[in-house]
Amino acid sequence: MSVANVTMFEFQTSESIEEFASWYKGHGTYPNNDISLFVRTGETSAIGISVYPTEQDRQNADKLRNESASTDLSEIVKEIMPLSGDVLVHFLR
């Protein structure tokens, strides 16, 4: 069964979301990431959804996210609220 990280972000400014999206596009997805979505949900908020084939892959991505949050992204991201769980329904076209 696939597992997912659902991560809520609060950014310093609305421009910070665009800066993050550019950074993420340039750095690519995390290793073994099957699906990656990043959606603006408000002026300074967004949500990311990342799906992984195994719990170990998800945990490895958590470590990388935490490292990036404390270094590369610390100036533009105000708060990161990660959640995780099993993927129960998965549709792609």
Annotate each language-model stretch with its function:
Residues 1-70, 74-93:
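Short S/T/G/P-rich N-terminal loop/turn motif that feeds into the first structured element of a domain
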